[in-house]
Amino acid sequence: MRLSMRRALLAAGLALALVLAVHLGQRVLECQAVLGGPRGPRRTMRPEQEDLMMVGADHVEYRYGKAMPLIFVGGVPRSGTTLMRAMLDAHPEVRCGEETRIIPRVLAMRQAWSKSGREKLRLDEAGVTDEVLDAAMQAFILEVIAKHGEPARVLCNKDPFTLKSSVYLSRLFPNSKFLLMVRDGRASVHSMITRKVTIAGFDLSSYRDCLTKWNKAIEVMYAQCMEVGRDKCLPVYYEQLVLHPRRSLKVILDFLGIAWSDAVLHHEDLIGKPGGVSLSKIERSTDQVIKPVNLEALSKWTGHIPGDVLRDMAQIAPMLARLGYDPYANPPNYGNPDPIVINNTHRVLKGDYKTPANLKGYFQVNLNSTSSHLGSS
């Protein structure tokens, strides 16, 4: 099993390297043509004006470029990123779609090239400057986001670990906005462990280790969010989104500059429908977001974390207190839910919501296997 997984990762890495090589090769040739050859006089390149054009099923033409207001949704896995993107997908003007998985990998590679002084020197010597790399990254990311789903007026990407690169992405796409999903780390970690959601570097046999890694990841993402600025990055608390969906979504849509639609409150009604919410058959959150917003998962972690970890919680995960959570509250008081959420929860517990026909036969396989969310450390 390990060998086949390594081979799969190696194959994915080689494929990714090939795609990037093609993009970079094109950019280098363009640069050399504009700059007068590989050793010609250096001049500032003209900014590209080319847009990506797509035609929707309604025969409407959509044009996408680096100046468009992209939306990036991210956070530590198991923090409500799938729920958030499903709600946005329910909006008639927005399309997020499933995780691409490839965008955070590409961003991690770009970061690695920048951190290595020797590698950067080699790239610069070869004419693969930061300008060339950034143009290639911009084109590649936009192409993946635009073409992995149906076109829409507003495009959104949900890959949890992309928000470790918010500052860089805001440079590539200056009008983009970011939604950082924040959830009580104890709940996120309990969900990872019980649902066996493997994440690079997280030891799923240890609450202490996972909480330490959660703290490190959310610290990086939160710092990036603050650096980008409150006008471009909005922390969204999962608990408040669940308890008060209408109030929270009004704030979110106002922040994004998108008109209100009641459809965002009923994402479960639009699953699998044209122009609605497309769900992956293999993502671990799919079996949860087919249901309406409910309280089922809010405090499931209470009573499961070892006593020694609870005792040291403030030291293990100092970001809990920084984000406004009481590290010693067990169970915590997140607030009182809206009546609609209470009603939804009663209906979910009664079993009113069934798996859509197009998704049946996959969840049991998923729950008995592992799923990797790879993030740069």
Curated annotation (Swiss-Prot):
Its EC number is 2.8.2.20. It catalyses: L-tyrosyl-[protein] + 3'-phosphoadenylyl sulfate = O-sulfo-L-tyrosine-[protein] + adenosine 3',5'-bisphosphate + H(+). Disulfide bonds join 96-156, 225-233. Residues 26-377 are lumenal. The chain crosses the membrane at residues 9-25. Keywords: Disulfide bond, Glycoprotein, Golgi apparatus, Membrane, Signal-anchor, Transferase, Transmembrane, Transmembrane helix. N-glycosylated. It is found in: Golgi apparatus membrane. One of its GO terms (cellular component) is Golgi apparatus. Coiled coil: none annotated. GO terms for molecular function: protein-tyrosine sulfotransferase activity. One of its GO terms (biological process) is peptidyl-tyrosine sulfation. Residues 1-8 are cytoplasmic. Pfam families: Sulfotransfer_3. PANTHER family: PROTEIN-TYROSINE SULFOTRANSFERASE 2. This is Protein-tyrosine sulfotransferase 2. The gene is TPST2.
